[in-house]
């Protein structure tokens, strides 16, 4: 076998079908759209069901968007094990170390995983289990 004898696997390469380029191509004139009618002309808008009341309008409206909603960046306890014993952990320190990318409305510490270090953690929110786990490890918490 030589380089000039290499061939692609059968069926792996497709030729783009150019429609509307003469009747002998098999897809000339009407370009595979059939005869006249709405679908033979322009595009139909997304969600259009041929004049039938569309699904997104048949289903009732629900809920609202709370404009004062606060979204917190979540940090799990097992991520805090990368710090040394006795470190004071602040939101700026978490951002500098790449644990948090976007602070959003603040930082919330959750009790996912085990904490093996004695740390002072300063954050905007804590789960009750996270506070218990930090204090059990000999550390302390402070709400900002």
From Swiss-Prot:
Region (Disordered): 1-44
One GO biological process term: translation
Alphabetically ordered keywords of this record: Ribonucleoprotein, Ribosomal protein, RNA-binding, rRNA-binding
Ranges of biased composition (kind: Gly residues): 23-35
A GO cellular component annotation in the UniProt record: cytosolic large ribosomal subunit
Highest taxon, organism lineage: Bacteria
Pfam families per record: Ribosomal_L27A
InterPro entries: Ribosomal_uL15 (IPR030878), Ribosomal_uL15/eL18 (IPR021131), Ribosomal_uL15/eL18_sf (IPR036227), Ribosomal_uL15_bac-type (IPR005749), Ribosomal_uL15_CS (IPR001196)
Molecular-function annotations in GO: rRNA binding; structural constituent of ribosome
Subunit field text: Part of the 50S ribosomal subunit.
Main function: Binds to the 23S rRNA.
Family statement: Belongs to the universal ribosomal protein uL15 family.
Protein name: Large ribosomal subunit protein uL15
Species whose genome carries this gene: Leuconostoc mesenteroides subsp. mesenteroides (strain ATCC 8293 / DSM 20343 / BCRC 11652 / CCM 1803 / JCM 6124 / NCDO 523 / NBRC 100496 / NCIMB 8023 / NCTC 12954 / NRRL B-1118 / 37Y)
Lineage of producing organism: Bacteria, Bacillati, Bacillota, Bacilli, Lactobacillales
């Amino acid at each position: 076998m030589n380089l000039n004898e290499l061939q692609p696997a059968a069926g792996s390469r497709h030729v783009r079908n150019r429609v509307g380029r003469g009747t002998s191509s098999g897809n000339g004139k009407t370009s595979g759209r059939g005869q006249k009618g709405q679908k033979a002309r322009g595009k139909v808008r997304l969600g259009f069901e041929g004049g039938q009341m569309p699904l997104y309008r048949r289903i009732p409206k629900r809920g609202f968007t709370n404009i004062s909603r606060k979204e917190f960046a979540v940090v799990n306890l097992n991520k805090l094990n990368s710090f040394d014993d006795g470190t004071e952990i602040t939101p700026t320190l978490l951002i500098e170390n790449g644990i948090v990318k976007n602070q959003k409305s603040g930082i919330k510490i959750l009790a996912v995983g085990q904490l093996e270090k004695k740390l002072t953690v300063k954050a905007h929110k804590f789960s009750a289990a996270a506070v218990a786990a930090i204090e059990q490890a000999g550390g302390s918490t402070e709400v900002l």
